[in-house]
Every structure is written in C-alpha cells, then in structure tokens.
C-alpha cells in the first residue's frame, strides 16, 4: 500500500485534485481543489483522502500515522513554500486549520480545529509579526480551547454542567466586569491560556502538547475519529449516508478574521436556502473567527444592505440603529463585498447549484475557505431547480434529479409557524409516522372526535393506545393522531398518511388511562379537552396550542410534476378508499387507484349495523338479507371513485380483514347491538367469542372469507360491476380491476374468479350490456410469489402487498417491531426498517421471482405494488428496475413517488 497516493495538495491556482474527486477527497477537499483551478483565492493546503479514514479504523492510529508521515511532511513544505512561513518555526510560524469533509455534506457533524501550531514561542512571534499581541493571544486561546475539546476530550462532566473552557471565560469576564469576549484584554487572554492549560493538566494528567507536529497528528486522528461520533452516526442514518464512505481531512494555512476591525469572517448563500429566492444573503462578524458566526456568541450582521434592512425590520431595529450598530458588509467593506458578490456568482454559475460559502477577510483581503452545494428546504429545492431551468443554467433532466423526492413531503402538509416553535414545550417524542403539523384538544375515542367536529366544528387530537379500522371515522375527523403503540406502518400510520393526516405513533412513554381519560407523561398530566400539538415530521408532541400554517404549493411544484411525468417509465397510482381521497390523489397526478380497501367503507354511517347483521346471521339466507342492504351503499361508493378517476384504472380489493374486526368487543356495545337486532345478548356474546382468532393476520381473512362465504364476493362484485356500468352510461370511461387478497394457492384464486365472472355475467344479462374488467390478485403470501407461474394462469394482474409480504417473509409483526427494531438497527442486524424501505434481498427477491415466473406464463401480466413502500423513493427505484408497471401509495405520497420514478428512469438512462 506504500505506493497509494494518500495526500493531494492545492494552492496558488494549482491543485493535484479536482471537483470530480468527491469520493476520494470529500466534498470540501474536491471543491477546494476546484476553486484553486478556477482562480478563486483559497489559502494553500492539502487533503488526506477518505481511504485513509477506512485505513484508520482498520489498522489503527499508529500504522496510519506511519503511512501518512512522508506525504504529509512533503505537503506541509508546499504550504511553507507558498506562504513564506514554516511549520513549527519560532520566527515565522505557520499556523493551520484541520477540517473534516465527507463526500456528502454533513454540516457541523464532525470536528474542526483552528490555529494549530500555536505554542508559547509561536504566540510571541505572531504578536511581533502582526504588531497585534491581543490577536495573537486570542488565537492561542481559541486553539487551546478547540484542541482541548476535540482532541483531548475536555467535555462537560455531565449534561447538567457547562463546557469547562466556557466556565473559565465567564469567570474571567465576571472578574473583569465585562460582557463580551472581545472586551477581554491581552493580559486577560494570557491568563485564560494559562488557566486552560492548567484545566487540561488537571483533567487529563498530561501537559498540553507544545510540539506542532504532535498537535497535527492528534488533530488529524481526532477528525478521523469524529466520523464515528454519535451525532455523525445519527446524521448519516437520517440522510442515508453509508458509514464506509469515511471522511477526508483538509489541512490549510490559517487566514485570520480576528486581526482587528479590518478583518471578518462569514457564511453566505448564493440564494435563499429557506425560500429559494434568487437573493445573495449571509452573515458576517467583524474581528472574529469562523466558529463565532455559528456559535451565536455575538449577533452576526447581514452581508447585503437589503438583507440587513429585512433583518432590522424583523427585529424592530430602527434604520439609524441598524446603520450604526449592525451595518452590512456591503456598507462596511464595499470593495470586499463587491469581490465576494462576484465570486459567489462565479461559483454558482460554475457549479450550477446554490452555493453555501465560508469566507474570511484578513486585513482587508478576501479568502474563500469552503464552498458546497447548500442545504435547503423542500420549497427552496423546487424553486431553485425550476428557476435555474428557466435561467438556462441547467436542463430539464438535471432539474428533476436536483429535487429529492422525500423532501417534497415538506410542501404537502401543514407546518408549524417557525416563530411559535421557539416557545413550544416538547413533552414526549414518538415516531414521525405521517408528516405535517396538527394542534387541538385531546380526545380518547373516535366517536368523541366525530362529536367534537360535528357539534363544535373543532378538530381534536385523537389519542389511542393503538388504532383499529373502527376508529377510521374519528381519525378522519381528527386534526391528528397520537398512539402509544405501533410503528411507521401501523394502522394509524398507514391510514393517517393515506388521509394526509399528521400522526405520531409509538410514543411508548405515554400512560393512557381510558377510564380517567388522562395521559401521564414525563411529569405532565393531560386531561381530555387539554390542547396538545403534534409534529408529524419529527415525532415531537408539544404541550398546548402551537400555531400552524398551510403548505403553499406554487406553480413551480406543478411544473416539476409535469417534468417527472415526462421522464418516468413507472406509473404512479394511489391507495384511496373514498371519492375524496381519489380526487386528492388525482389532483396530485395519480394515474389510477392501485388499492381501494372496501372494508373501510363498512364503517361509514349505518353500514356497520348491516355488516354486523351479516356477520352474526345464523345462515346464508340471513347473510344475504344483510348483504342486500350493503349492496346499494357499496355501489354508490364505487360510482364516486370511478367518476373521480375519469377513466384511469381503479383496483378494488375484495374484503380482506377477519370478521372479528367488525363486531363490538365491549359488553355495553354488544347489548346495544342485541337490542337493535332483537336477539338475546348471550347470542351476540357467544358469536363474538366464536369469531375471535389467536393469530388473525394469518387467520380467516382475505380470499378465505370469500371462499367460505361466497355471497360476500358476489355482493361486492355486483356492486363494482353495476357501479361501473352506471358511470359508463354517463359517458365517463371506466377501467375496472377486481383484486382478490391473500391468495397463496392458485386454486383459491380460481374459485374466487369463477364467482366474480358468474356474477358479472348475471349483471350483463340483466342490463343487456357489457364492459371489460380484469381479475387479479395481491401477492402477499410468500407461497404465491414462489408459485406465481401457476397463479398467473388465473390472474390478469399482480399487485404486491408489500406490508403483509414483508411480515410473512421476515416473520416480523409490523405493530410489534418497535420493541426490537432500534436494537437491530443499532447492532447492524438490520440496515433499515423493512416496513419503510423494501427489503431487496428477501422480499425484493420474491417480487423479482414472481414477476419473472408470472410473465413466463402470461407475457403481458401487469405488475405493481400497493404497500406503503410504493411511496418510499428507494423502494420505488427498486420497482422500476424490477420491471413493475406501477406503484401505488397514499395520496399525499403520490408526488414523491412520481419524482422517485423519474429519478429511477433518468439514472438508468
């Protein structure tokens, strides 16, 4: 490995690397090299590659330092040559910064050290050379503080305690009777350096390292070590950044923003990262170093006059006060500002994306320390992409790929007002099951949510230990849903996403007492009627009412969706159970309904009575009487769906849940039902007990119901076909697909298809008319995937129900996985939650096999998925490459799936 190049130098408009070497040099190192090559003023330095980070963890510190030493010493000589200073010299000491830089931007997640090379001799030399002793000692103080924290582990002893260095600074300021760090004198700073080093000796038992080379190796290894710190690991997990990528380390000659009033440091953006507005903006501080801007120790000032005036207006600062106390860089250093503005424009035009820039002004000279593609909100992401397309900076394909599918979520749901959030009190945190923001009074039962909306026109927060299909109406009428149990694909989560409702699930610390109608959590007692607020994007629950604002879907969003459609191969449908859901999905660009769950319709109004009548009937004749009552209701529902979808395909799933989900389980409700049906209570109780199942997910449900009670399939088929023919008569085309759930054996499906076909023929004969329809099945039992060649003899389409297919393939209950999932993720047993991101090697392999076998039997077999994975970007990508025809997801995930489908097609091309 000795011949492997581990260090790449840059400086004086030359560089050994370039902007295309992100994998090797990290984003920062690659861009520092590229900025040099295009003539931007950048302090000279070198970058140690990401491969060395992997070596560090594989071989250890000592081996890696040995491998690096010759190249680092050579690279340091290059900096010395370009600066005229020498590392470790007593007369002209070279000071450097040591920074991390992964290939994906991870702002603030890893460690940085400034002013490295400082010691008792260097500080005197710097003071003499600059004729500015205060600056020299301030730089020394900062170095000891940063090095002590990052390399020597000088952290607070507990979360209740403060940073040990900050405590010493506060004590010094109190002793001197001053408020700001900048008010400390040279002698104060000398005293602080002495006290800092004493604190290091006391806590570590070692003297603070004085040798610059020892300092450098300590810093380089600490930056590599920070790749595996807690916050970096969490950030990578949240942003799907692989741990094996590693970080590069960039070492640069220091330039100083803290040399006096002609020096400054700042951060700028070429466009507004929050709104996407084409407005150069940023903050700076006079006489400061980089970390001061982000640390918030002093109030940063705005770079532009326009930005400064906007800031002053928001802060109720007068124009006179703004000019005197908080002037913009444009006003204070107009020549430097002009150069900075030209550079940011040059960088944006060159990299063709919004730039996040770090800069330092040393004694009136501007230096660029970093540029990277800036992080941005979902709204800004779309606006910037579409603006740059209109400006001719990027083409259509780039505009589509520039927008992250998952970030579209931010545009589709209500959000909390940012100002109100600052004062919000978090009482518990659960899983961010369905994005958005919701606020309202607490209720514990679905009927109370319905009642509150009906009587008070107020949407409540429905709080449940867990939800069931019976809670559907209450969930619909609620502002948001909070559950103590359940994961990201639990009933509450799936249904809430389908409705576009804010939902926080799996908040296990909640102690819910249905009888007392109270919640106890973390020392709070919340009673029914008390207000709480839910953040479905973070999983946080707040005490009281937090103001919300509706998401604003601009014209740019619509244009992006049109581009997504243009470049997609995979179609996107929606899971929708009502005409309202269908209309919402259609508005978001759904090209059909991939899953209509007929059981959800059974809970509307008085229908549940007819359903229960059917379930509790003694014989087939009794069931048929009850089903006859349901027929017109179901027919009306389907008519609404067919009309809403305007000729796009509608896939209707026949009854799926076990019958016990539809019957009352409490004595009071059972007695009311007995009274309504005019039968003894004991008969109802006995029947309910008889319907109970030990493992209902694998029990009497799906096609098993239709095969044991054929009259259910008959009624539903008749309702579907009659509705389709009624809508067809109005001149609206209808494309009907009838889907049989939970098939594991081709004979099950054949039996159901015979019932469907016979019933359809009866309707055609009665009406003296016909229409085309298809019969297919959900592939959710692993055996169905393995025997897909047989099932395709009967089925005209496959729809993969990935929720249940995942449960049965992995043997995980999606409602109970929260008990062990965090441990499995932490230990690396699982890479992702398989109910959120499709398990490609297991479930995915079954899907590929089923598609291959199915199309071997029926060449034009249409295949799609209708589980929640249909709206998850990486799962959508898998579906594209697996050769599926469509994905189907919740209406509010349709835009995400559409964009993900376009990404997959463009990546393949």
Residue ranges and their predicted role:
Residues 77-89, 519-521, 761-770:
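Short mixed-charge
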Residues 1-424, 458-461, 468-473, 479, ...:
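Nucleotide/phosphate-binding sheet-loop regions of phosphoryl- and nucleotidyl-transfer enzymes
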Residues 99-100, 553, 563-909:
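Conserved alpha/beta-domain cores
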Residues 46, 484-486, 505-508, 596, ...:
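Short beta->alpha connector loops at strand-helix junctions that form conserved
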Residues 365-367, 468-476, 480, 488-495, ...:
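Glycine-rich phosphate/ribose-binding loops and adjacent secondary-structure elements
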Residues 70-73, 238, 400-454, 458-461, ...:
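Long, charged amphipathic helices and adjacent flexible linkers at domain junctions
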Residues 14-22, 434-477, 843-859:
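C-terminal accessory/binding modules appended to enzymatic or scaffolding proteins
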